[in-house]
């Protein structure tokens, strides 16, 4: 190694005899040192993409979910007993992920995988959860009686006070009984704003949250208290004295 210490940019000039010995030293060092110029490649592992079965017809794309429906099934080689292995293959890509996932299951196995029917069912449930105003307009615009609104069916099957889910004109008038009578409009019992018609007051209650008002929550709470009081005293109706406690 002392021979290499003579190699310096600012040092003295090396004689030609010393330089002639350097190739021999380098060659001997090169034979003894490990071969680092050639990186050792890891054993090639077949990636999932390379191990994919042959493409089968029937690809479906819907909202980022690739579903390959095999007709009848993808055939992946032969089994040791001579029977052909059949697999149900699905490519699944979540909407929040840039990667796709390849799912395969044997036809005879009972392992559950992500199927396209579940995606359609989830999307159907997501589409059925429309806003209240949109659902009301869709239900009111359906001409045939067969097209029943799923929201109304949910309300009817929901246990408890189904009438407290929506605010009606009767509820608005009942809440206004404990306020001074207005000569030229209807007053909101929550924010005390005055509206010319009863329909405009109801629209304010339903859509007031877009403007920062919580009147809809107030009327819902008020109606829930009315229901609890009617349930506690089923023979009595709400009177003026009992309603003044909600002011």
From Swiss-Prot:
Stretches for region Disordered: 125-164
Listed InterPro entries: Spt46-like (IPR040879)
Polar residues composition bias: residue spans: 137-147
GO biological process, one term: fusion of sperm to egg plasma membrane involved in single fertilization
Protein localization: Nucleus membrane
Pfam families, alphabetized: Spt46 (PF17734)
Keywords: Differentiation, Membrane, Nucleus, Spermatogenesis
Cellular component terms per the entry's GO annotation: nuclear membrane
The keyword Nucleus is assigned to this record: yes
Entry keyword Membrane: yes
Primary role: Plays a role in spermiogenesis and fertilization.
Protein name as it appears in the record: Spermatogenesis-associated protein 46
Organism for this UniProt entry: Bos taurus (Bovine)
Gene: SPATA46
């Amino acid at each position: 190694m002392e021979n290499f210490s003579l190699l310096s940019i600012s040092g003295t000039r090396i004689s030609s005899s010393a330089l002639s010995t350097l190739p021999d030293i380098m060659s001997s060092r090169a034979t003894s040192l490990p071969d680092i110029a050639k990186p050792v490649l890891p054993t090639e592992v077949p990636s999932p993409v390379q191990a994919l079965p042959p493409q089968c017809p029937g690809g479906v794309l819907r909202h980022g979910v690739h579903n390959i429906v095999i007709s009848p099934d993808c055939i992946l080689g032969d089994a040791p007993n001579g029977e052909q292995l059949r697999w149900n293959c699905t490519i699944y890509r979540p909407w929040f992920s840039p990667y796709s996932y390849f799912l395969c299951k044997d036809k005879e196995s009972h392992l559950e995988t992500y199927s396209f029917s579940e995606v359609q069912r989830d999307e159907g449930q997501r589409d059925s959860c429309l806003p209240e105003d949109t659902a009301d307009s869709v239900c009111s615009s359906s001409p045939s009686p067969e097209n029943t609104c799923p929201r109304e069916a949910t309300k009817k099957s929901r246990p408890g006070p189904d009438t407290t889910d929506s605010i009606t004109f009767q509820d608005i008038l009942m809440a206004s009984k404990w306020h001074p009578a207005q000569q030229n409009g209807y007053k909101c019992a929550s924010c005390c704003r005055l509206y010319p018609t009863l329909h405009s007051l109801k629209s304010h209650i339903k859509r007031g949250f877009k403007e920062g008002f919580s009147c809809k929550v107030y009327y819902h709470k008020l109606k829930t208290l009315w229901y609890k009081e009617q349930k506690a005293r089923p023979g009595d109706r709400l009177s003026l004295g009992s309603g003044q406690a909600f002011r």
